[in-house]
Regions:
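Hydrophobic alpha-helical segments
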Residues: 90, 94, 119, 147-154
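Histidine-centered, metal-coordinating catalytic motifs and their short helical/loop contexts
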Residues: 134-154
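Exposed alpha-helical structural elements
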Residues: 15, 33-36, 40, 63, ...
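Amphipathic alpha-helical interface elements
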Residues: 56-114
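Long, charge-rich alpha-helical interaction segments
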Residues: 1-55
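Short, charged amphipathic alpha-helical segments flanked by flexible coils
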Residues: 96-140
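Residue-level detector of alpha-helix boundaries and kinks
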Residues: 53, 72, 135-136
Length: 154
């Protein structure tokens, strides 16, 4: 759960769920007190479980928000802030129609949001027009600025 790589967290949760299912019969027969723990663990990690995150980006982004909620519930502010920044970049790539996992696309999305939250940037953001067309552009800019402050504080 402490991974800063959200796609790996999703697939690790998928593997955990399979392991829990495989162990369920033995636990039920031989370790009855642990059955509740098994159910609790499954309940916590099932919402963030995804076998192939790259296959469905809207679902992947939704699952990453579930990971973010878990971080916040546990008071893990730094991983939450890190994930939220990565999530915004991924969501922007997807919104711009750019393949999310290609690093050049992620750099374009991040450069755009950085430039648009920096007073008088010295460069023209690569996806400025696409970003400004988003209804939620002002909210994203505000959130990005706040996340920058959180990251710098931590």
């Amino acid at each position: 759960m402490d991974l800063a790589r959200p796609l790996e967290t999703l697939t690790a949760s998928e593997r955990l769920e399979k392991s829990l299912t495989a162990a369920a019969a033995d636990i039920k027969d031989y370790a009855i007190p642990f059955e509740q723990l098994l159910d609790f663990t499954r309940e916590k990690y099932q919402p963030i479980s995804l076998k192939k995150p790259e296959a469905d980006w809207p679902l992947t982004l939704s699952k990453q928000l579930a990971i973010l909620r878990l971080y916040l519930e546990r008071g893990q502010i730094l991983p939450a802030a890190t994930l939220m920044r990565e999530w915004i970049v991924s969501a922007l790539c997807w919104q711009f129609g750019l393949p999310v996992q290609i690093s050049e696309n992620r750099e374009k999305a991040e450069a755009t949001i950085n430039a648009l939250t920096t007073p008088n940037p010295s460069w023209e953001p690569p996806c400025k027009e696409e970003f400004l067309e988003l209804d939620c552009a002002p909210q994203i800019q505000n959130l990005w600025s706040q996340l920058r402050e959180v990251r710098n504080t931590l």
